[in-house]
From Swiss-Prot:
Location in or out of the cell: Cytoplasm
The keyword Glycoprotein appears for this protein: no
Any one Gene Ontology molecular-function term assigned to this protein's record: RNA-DNA hybrid ribonuclease activity
Pfam families per UniProt: RNase_HII
Name under which the protein is recorded: Ribonuclease HII
First-tier enzyme category under EC: hydrolase
Phylogenetic classification of the source organism: Bacteria, Bacillati, Bacillota, Bacilli, Bacillales
Domain of life from the UniProt record: Bacteria
GO cellular component: a single term: cytoplasm
Amino acid sequence: MSKRLSIKEIDALLRQGDASIDETFLAMLKADERKGVQSALKRYERQLEKEKALWMEHEEMLAYEKDLWAKGYEHVAGLDEVGRGPLAGPVVTAAVILPKDVQLPGLTDSKKLAKETRESFYDRIKEVALAWSVAIVPVTVIDEVNIYQATKQGMMSAIDQLSVNPDALLLDAMNLPLSLPQQSLIKGDQKSLSIAASSVLAKVTRDRYMADLANRYPEYGFERHVGYGTEEHLAALNAHGITPEHRRSFRPVQETAATRQTS
């Protein structure tokens, strides 16, 4: 790069992470007196720091997997659920087995990710995973056995559906009646990459389910609150009553049903 580049050209190179960027080039930019060059350089350095932090977090979130891999457990499945708290809709569970060379920087608890980022990870996880599965447990089962047992059933089903048999499990605050070695981690979707991956698959699947439900019952606003007991949802329950997708074993739904029967 012998000729003096314009600020626009420099900014484009830095934004693209061009292969020609080396220590010599960066030293040249630091010595450049133009304010626009210094602004572009600072932006580039901030981006590098951000990427470095993401990779550090990525390594930290593989600590549990690496420990199990080192002990000879080749196929470690992470499991998580989405939808235990809502008044309507299913609880969705997912299981994911990641390869040892997995690269998913930025992946964390699905609730902390923007929708577009979550959707992107959803596709990427399915591409790179050794195996993945999703189980949807309907309202009828939730009402029959309770939400905790329904969640367990969903996780067992997700494990059964995996195309690769896991030999160890990482779970988000759950224990399953299985002989497989398993670790239950509080806030596991923030501590384990495998659990975080399963939380993304579960959440995207459930959000899409609730969006479809919103088309069937547009007056309830399911596309916004996804079944949780928000003010909007409770008002819709009082105004329109209970749908087949509402959990009759949950108190706010029971109270709505009782109120409408006596009115």
